[in-house]
Amino acid sequence: MATKNNPSPKPMGTAQGDPGEAGTLPAPEAGIRDTGSTQLKAKPKKIRKIKALVIDLGSQYCKCGYAGEPRPTYFISSTVGKRSAEMAADAGDTFKETYVGHELLNMEASLKLVNPLKHGVVVDWDCIQNIWEYIFHTAMKILPEEHAVLVSDPPLSPTSNREKYAELMFETFGIPAMHVTSQALLSIYSYGKTSGLVVESGHGVSHVVPISEGDLLPGLPSRVDYAGCDLTNYLMQLLNEAGHKFSDDHLHIIEHIKKKCCYAALLPEEEMSLGLDELHVDYELPDGKVITIGQERFRCSEMLFKPSLVGSTQPGLPELTATCLDRCQGTGFKEEMAANVLLCGGCTMLDGFPERFQRELSLLCPGDSPTVAAAPERKTSVWTGGSILASLQAFQQLWVSKEEFEERGCAAIYSKC
């Protein structure tokens, strides 16, 4: 569901209004309560500004920070460590049951690692609560009841998600106001636009979402269940086939190799004909051993264009995008969408990906002349769009207050989000 009556966003740095404001709240000492028979003249209320937070919960990292800032302040792993019942019984009351963020780094006991999102959809709400508790109390060291919160929601996720977000925020954390809106909508705002075709590929899922004047075109958003984590796993497979010995325990190393050494080839067939001397790079492992990486550098990214390489029957990202463009024909928005294809998400940050994607999409849609844009900060496009939106003066009327939620329940969420 699109945010209703959203104001037009502007690129970061030109947002209207005071950054991060979410209206005002009376200070704790404001006024004197009437206790009954004695009538006391109330003191003038002191008004304090409250800074809004923006939280983008992704499959790999939860990105958070204050509205009005150009980039997130914190990147917190979306993985939660839980002790088993046996471990908890052995430890008694001396250890916590769940661990988030840096708490996972110094744990000697083995933990069950849980990711609360599967392909971008929340599957464990207890873990979401654990992550938010860590954000408020440990990372940011703030009182949640003093801050409005804007939360991003993946496209095509159940509408009940928004109700759960509201229940957690209002009932568990006591925040004064909140808003939930689509990740795709926030991504397009990061480009300073309200219309375009968002092609977003993060860690756990990829989406193609057409948006016109701030509204998601109904029935047209598409998704595929592959993204950056699948690319990482495929790179590990290719490296092992080349004689290396990596396991799931080394995925953080493979992730670093992907970011530092890999790319998408514009013409993969020509790249395959290059000699090792022209392709290879040396990479030093944490133990000091140096390995040589050759064709794996670009072969790993081919799975984004040919998902069959990793056993998926779903279409590649260019094909998914071309299909979505064709479906826009009947709505009259095809030309507008083709002129504004916007890449978002960390998986699209791979060197050479925008150029390769542009080439493949142009071959699939020769008559549409698609134009692909790739903003430098697109890895955090969802969060940045939220920061812009929550800073706009015209947006402040769209916050759902705690009082509204208590009076109207979920109807308050759906009337403004």
From Swiss-Prot:
Phosphoserine: residues carrying this PTM: 8
Name of the protein in question: Actin-like protein 7B
InterPro entries xref list: Actin, ATPase_NBD
Residues forming coiled coils: none
Cell location: Cytoplasm, Cytoskeleton
Similarity section: Belongs to the actin family.
Lineage: Eukaryota, Metazoa, Chordata, Craniata, Vertebrata
GO cellular component: cytoplasm; cytoskeleton; nucleus
Highest taxon, organism lineage: Eukaryota
Keyword vocabulary terms for this entry: Cytoplasm, Cytoskeleton, Phosphoprotein
Source organism of the structure: Rattus norvegicus (Rat)
Region (Disordered): 1-39
